[in-house]
Structure formats: structure tokens, C-alpha cells
Swiss-Prot record:
The chain crosses the membrane at residues 297-315. Keywords: Hydrolase, Lipid droplet, Lipid metabolism, Membrane, Mitochondrion, Transmembrane, Transmembrane helix. Residues 2-251 form the GP-PDE domain. One of its GO terms (molecular function) is phosphatidylglycerol phospholipase C activity. Disruption phenotype: Leads to the accumulation of phosphatidyl glycerol. This is Phosphatidylglycerol phospholipase C. Coiled coil: none annotated. Disulfide bonds: none annotated. Present with 3270 molecules/cell in log phase SD medium.
């Protein structure tokens, strides 16, 4: 059975990463709730996807340049009763909700000290390391963060995944884990864009290595019925989705592949179909995107806008992100 991971808790129906969204994702039976961590200028670890607050909250602040005293006064644009949560609050919530599991997307725009702070806060909330090791998955974007977590010991015996748009970066984590050959710090999985799983690089080169070494695959952000069909034709461990209720129904309607076989083979749709046009166009977009976003020049701002941000807005418009 595919593990259903609520993206930003329950983004499709409720204000993302808020207490309301967490409650609804838990009630919906999400296997894991994915959320995002940022850190204020005075070291408070908070739950928010963006590094600034303008999209979700009633005043635009850069979290890393603002104090907790400033951030805590913000209210959600969609529901004024909701405030930004701290990591401590959401971990306390998890303790009070039996079986709740969290996937922590730790943004690389923060300082690495956020990892140590996160570890310390876990033990402040409940001084039981085994409890947290069974309930927390660390999501890291850059290889030096994985190395930092190993050097400091904070990742020991936790589930750790690499989150990346790039299969090359995901492969770097896999290689480091295999070279390290330490069960206490073994990479649990990779979390990659759903379109990357359609590529030959993933299916023919990376996937066999992952399966041989029992490294799981999560795909984000999977919402459309056709994309769940593709997902279920591959040995995918988890779907990160905006709507956990809809996702469970869609997954239940398909037989999930345990491993690539002649009987259960991933079949790319024909270019002669609407699904096929989308499929092949999205692969082209994905390949171009990976090339562009890892180029320094696309992050240069002109009139306050970077090319990377314009690309991001376009991709949201076509439901690529």
C-alpha cells in the first residue's frame, strides 16, 4: 500500500501548515504529515513553507530577518484565528495524537543550527529519543546537511530522506549512504518530483540501485488521477499529496507495483493522446527546469523579480508544481 503523506498537512482544503490543517490531515488518516521548518533571527524554529510571509500571512516579513516577537503577531489571511506555529507546538500536538508521524522539510535557506535546535526541541517536548525516531522523518536538500547531521549525531537512527528536484543530487545522497555503510545513518529514501519518475534516468538507472539497497521513493506533489496511475505502476513507497482523502481513494483504485516486472510494467502514454502530450511535454519541462534552476544567473533579480521566480509562477500555473 502506498504511504499517503499530507503535503503541508492538508493544503488542498485548509490553510497550509496551520493547526487546522494538521487536525484535518490526522482525521483524514494521512500516514504521515509533511511540514516545513524555518528559523527566525532570534532562533525560534517555526512552521512555514516560504522564507517570507506575504503569501500566507497578513504582513510580509522575511522570517530569517525577523524576531519571533514580530512573527507571532501575524495572522492567516484566509482565517484570522490562525497564527504561525512553532516547531515545539506541532511536536506537542504530535505527542497528543497517537500514531501521528511527521516529515520535516528543513529548508536549506536556514543555518544548519536549525537541525540541532530541532533535535533539542524534540527532547524538550518528550524526553524519549526512541519515540521521535519512530515518528519523525528528516527531509534534507543538500549533501553537506546530511554530513552535518552525521557529524553531530542528530540523525542517528532517524529516517532521513533527500528532497530534490534533481535526480543527480538524490544520487549523491544515495552514494554517500552506500559509501558510509553505517546502519545508524542509512538513507531511508528519496523524495523527488513526480515527473522525474517518468524519466529513463530514474526508471533504468537510479531505481534498480534504490531497490537493491532498500531505499524508498516518495513523489511530490501528486494530485491528478492520471499521475496516481503512473505512480502505482512503479514501486513507489509514498505519495506526497495536497489532499490525503482523495489520494487514498485514487491509490486504492490501482494495483501497486512491488517491483518492476514483465506483468506490471510502466508504460508511457502515446503522443497521440492528451495524456501523452502532457506526459512528454512535462518531461521536457522537467529536463529544462533542472538545467536552469541550478544555474546561478537565473537567481539574479531584475526589478525585484528573478527568472527563477518567474519560472516558478509559470510552473504553478500549468500545475507542474
Amino acid at each position: 500500500m502506498v504511504e499517503i503523506v499530507g503535503h503541508r498537512a492538508f493544503k488542498a482544503r485548509y490553510p497550509e501548515n496551520t493547526l487546522l490543517a494538521f487536525e484535518k490531515a490526522y482525521a483524514a488518516g494521512a500516514d504521515v504529515i509533511e511540514t516545513d521548518l524555518q528559523m527566525t533571527s532570534d532562533g525560534m524554529v517555526v512552521v512555514n513553507h516560504d522564507s517570507d510571509t506575504g503569501r500566507m500571512w497578513d504582513k510580509n516579513l522575511v522570517i530569517g530577518e525577523s524576531t519571533w516577537e514580530e512573527v507571532k503577531r501575524l495572522r492567516c489571511k484566509e482565517d484570522g484565528s490562525l497564527a504561525m506555529m512553532t516547531l515545539k507546538e506541532i511536536l506537542t500536538w504530535a505527542v497528543c495524537h497517537p500514531g501521528a508521524k511527521l516529515m520535516l522539510d528543513i529548508k536549506f535557506t536556514n543555518e544548519k543550527i536549525i537541525m540541532i535546535k530541532t533535535f533539542v526541541i524534540m527532547l524538550e517536548v518528550k524526553n524519549d529519543l526512541k519515540f521521535w525516531q519512530e515518528r519523525i522523518t528528516w527531509g534534507l536538500w543538500l549533501l553537506d546537511w546530511y554530513d552535518f547531521g552525521i557529524e553531530t549525531g542528530v540523525l542517528k537512527d532517524f529516517k532521513v530522506i533527500v528532497i530534490s528536484l534533481s535526480l543527480d543530487i538524490a544520487s549523491q545522497f544515495v552514494k554517500r549512504s552506500l559509501t558510509l555503510n553505517d546502519p545508524h545513518y542509512k538513507l531511508f529514501g528519496i523524495s523527488v518530483h513526480f515527473v522525474s519518475s517518468w524519466t529513463s534516468q530514474f526508471r533504468l538507472r537510479l531505481l534498480p540501485v534504490l531497490m537493491k539497497n532498500d531505499i524508498k521513493v516518495y513523489l511530490w506533489t501528486v494530485n491528478k488521477p492520471i499521475d496516481f496511475k503512473y505512480l502505482c505502476e512503479l514501486p513507489i513507497h509514498g505519495a506526497i499529496t495536497d489532499d490525503p482523502i482523495k489520494a487514498r481513494k485514487l491509490c486504492d483504485g490501482h494495483t501497486v507495483a512491488k517491483k518492476p516486472t514483465a506483468e506490471k510494467k510502466f508504460v508511457a502514454p502515446s503522443l497521440a493522446s492528451v495524456d501523452g502530450l502532457r506526459f512528454h511535454a512535462f518531461i521536457k519541462v522537467y529536463n529544462i527546469l533542472c538545467t536552469l534552476l541550478y544555474s546561478k544567473w537565473v537567481h539574479i533579480k531584475l526589478c525585484g523579480w528573478s527568472i527563477a521566480y518567474v519560472i516558478f509562477l509559470f510552473l504553478r500555473t500549468i500545475h507542474f508544481l
